[in-house]
């Protein structure tokens, strides 16, 4: 009997571990800026698709910044900025830290908060480990060009590099250059390129954010809140953020569209530049006719949710789908696979204790008339919902259909009552940068149509040279360096859709010095 009991305990432990493994990621990044065109390679199918702002980024994803473009990814309190014709792969991303890979192109990394597990950047010739918050430059060379030396630079902060020929510690103003054959590690002085200066300006704007006083530094997407709203104290909920650039009649979860994003399923993608944190963390409430966002307790670790709403409606497979933004102390019931621990962590910042969360989680879902924000119910037809159409253009009049006996519309408590995922869960894939799969033979993807409906791209940045300005530092070098001379600036082919517009502008963009 003891043996049987031991086996039962073991099986229970395995089952519990399996339930925990089924939980979706609690920590994500977001595509926060696209100047031009970008693509995302999803972890679940490894296909490249057009990328728009506010799309969540998880471990296993890749991001490609197209020709003539610049792209930014926010990861908690840090940002990775990609120059044109550059790729960044996310190998690890969770509460403990991040591991990134740069197969090709130029990436500027701003680290404001270093997680306990640290942050590493993998390259073709070694590992770049971030030791302190700061700004870092990674240049892996341009796709399709001749082999170049890899440049890793510490603009500010502290890092280390470990490669085939040894390891070296780097301080502010230092970098390493490593040839493709990895025969040496050369320590050099580094200075900001024009791309770094653009990234530094962008980082400076976000660094001045007062929102860090009210939200956790691990909350992805808080950086734009100060630019588009104000924080005000309230007697019942503490600091509340109010958006300042919304139209009359605006309500949360109306300006954007729904996308089927694994592993969560239906995910809200907002149109606003600030529209990430307020729609994936916290709760909304109306204050004298103004909508305000309540972030929750700052000391609680934020857990990402695809949309903090309650879906409401009639029978499964109906013609319409409705939802209501959750208000203060209203429970979010995940409509995707999850464990009990996940539900507690997801709602912890808005309830007094775990027991209260458990009681709400196991209670029957309320009718639509029980929600504090029931006046802000939004409804669209099922086709517009599952087709990713702009919600504000397809809203249907009237609220969700009532339940049996003319009772308030019921809450859709399981995914089976939501519209099924579209047969084709992704947009037409953009040609993928083959260099990621075939090192040494990279080919940039061709320009593709712009992604998110209703999102016009920002003006493309003017091409500018970014030959790294480097000087040897004999006192710290591992091997006697060869003189570093800037390479000639080759003419680079412009994207077809921009040739006429930019034919009078500077023809060359960022290019790596060659040896």
What are these regions (language model features)?
Residues 9-10, 20:
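Cleavable N-terminal signal peptides
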Residues 177-515:
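Low-complexity, repeat-rich tail regions
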Residues 1-8:
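Bacterial N-terminal signal peptides that target proteins for export
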